[in-house]
Amino acid sequence: SKIKAAQAAGLKPILCVGETLQEREAGKASDVISGQIRAGLEGNGNTTGLVVAYEPIWAIGTGQSATPETAVEIMGGAILETLRSLHGSAADGISLLYGGSMNAGNAGEYAAQACIHGGLVGGAALQADSFLQVAAAVAAAKA
């Protein structure tokens, strides 16, 4: 798999998972995301350096983001449960990032959640000042 190849090359792979708005509204988000994780990690028992990012497809480039509660529901639920079913207690060492339109205004709310270890920042990272504000908000929430 690409994840396995990246690890073998000494890279820190990021497996991005997320659902469409239609999948979310149909109540299938958890199943879709669990399937994405299983497909992405199939045949790979190595969790070294692995990062999983939850990036709801419906939030990419829209300025919309999942509520922190929704992010926790997916990340602390479907993602962590699937990782634990595949890797047991080693799953607790996998970094979980939120990546759905994180910005300086909402980064602290996400980072304050125990199951969210950081952010996969897109548009807000294009300008140094904006990115530094995101980093400061995350650092303050994790302090």
Predicted regions and their residues:
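Active-site loop-to-helix "anion-binding N-cap" substructures in soluble metabolic enzymes
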Residues: 1-143
